[in-house]
Amino acid sequence: MAVPARKTSKTKKRMRRGHIKLNVPGLTPCPNCGELRKSHMVCPSCGYYDGKQVVNTNN
């Protein structure tokens, strides 16, 4: 079986994994209330989507 000839150093391992990272979700301000919300989703604070109230929020 193939076995690595030398131990992989921390630097080489970290350089190889440098592109692996967490992505920030795309947040946009709600045009109705101004709160940040995910794109193409109903606003959790006011319940509006595309200028229409979709979810009834008792605020």
Swiss-Prot record:
Spell out the protein name for this chain: Large ribosomal subunit protein bL32
> Could you tell me which SUPFAM superfamilies the record lists for this protein?
Zn-binding ribosomal proteins
- On the tree of life, the source organism's domain of life is Bacteria
Q: Does the keyword Ribonucleoprotein apply?
A: yes
Record keywords, A-Z: Ribonucleoprotein, Ribosomal protein
**Family, per the entry?**
Belongs to the bacterial ribosomal protein bL32 family.
Q: Name one GO molecular function term.
A: structural constituent of ribosome
Cited NCBIfam families? rpmF_bact
Q: Which organism is it from?
A: Limosilactobacillus reuteri (strain DSM 20016) (Lactobacillus reuteri)
Q: What is the lineage of its organism?
A: Bacteria, Bacillati, Bacillota, Bacilli, Lactobacillales
InterPro entries linked to this entry:
Ribosomal_bL32, Ribosomal_bL32_bact, Ribosomal_zn-bd
Task: Kindly indicate whether the keyword Ribonucleoprotein belongs to this entry.
Answer: yes
What GO cellular component term, any one, is given? large ribosomal subunit
Instruction: List GO BP terms, alphabetically.
Output: translation
